[in-house]
UniProtKB/Swiss-Prot annotation:
Entry's localization field: Cell inner membrane
Transmembrane domains' residue ranges: 15-35, 58-78, 83-103, 108-128
Gene Ontology CC terms, in alphabetical order: plasma membrane
A Pfam match: PsiE
Organism: Klebsiella pneumoniae (strain 342)
Family to which this protein belongs: Belongs to the PsiE family.
Keyword presence, Ribonucleoprotein: no
Protein name per Swiss-Prot or TrEMBL: Protein PsiE homolog
Major subcellular site: membrane
Gene designation per UniProt: psiE
Classification via InterPro entries: P_starv_induced_PsiE, P_starv_induced_PsiE-like
Topology of the protein relative to the lipid bilayer: Multi-pass membrane protein
Superkingdom of the organism of origin: Bacteria
Gene Ontology terms: biological process: cellular response to phosphate starvation
Length: 136
């Protein structure tokens, strides 16, 4: 690339990075609001005497952790020099599949397939945390 276009390319990259950062900041604020709402919902479900409230509480807890993990992912993005570590996506995937198993556990075959997916994600996490692939 010629040196004439280098300042323009740098400006475009900086502008796009700024837009991305602002978008993620807005998303983080929205997720914090939803996390607060989920906290109130969990408190409401906790004191509900209905027999199904235990299932709703467990489901709400897993959703709570999903919000928490997405917020942690955004925080880690800013702390690690504007990149997303792969292992955080794996954590979110594992939590999402656990939530799916809790909500939809009618079919034993589906639960087995979901469990195999969790096993694959755990193996992926182990590989990502091994010394060969560790960057942080």
């Amino acid at each position: 690339m010629s040196s004439v276009y280098r300042p323009l390319v740098n400006f475009i990259a900086t502008a796009m990075q700024t837009v991305l950062n602002l978008g993620l900041l807005c998303l983080g604020i929205i997720l914090i609001v939803f996390l607060g709402k989920e906290t109130l919902h969990l408190a409401d479900v906790l004191f509900t005497p209905e027999p199904t409230s235990k299932y709703r509480l467990v489901e709400g807890l897993v959703v709570y952790f999903l919000y928490f993990e997405f917020i942690a992912l955004i925080v880690k993005y800013f702390q690690s020099g504007f990149h997303f570590p792969l292992r955080y996506f794996v954590y979110i995937g594992i939590t999402a599949i656990v939530r799916l198993i809790i909500i939809d556990h009618e079919s034993p075959m589906a639960v087995l397939i979901y469990s195999a997916a969790i096993l694959i994600l755990v193996i992926t996490l182990w590989l990502c945390n091994s010394n060969r692939l560790k960057r942080e």
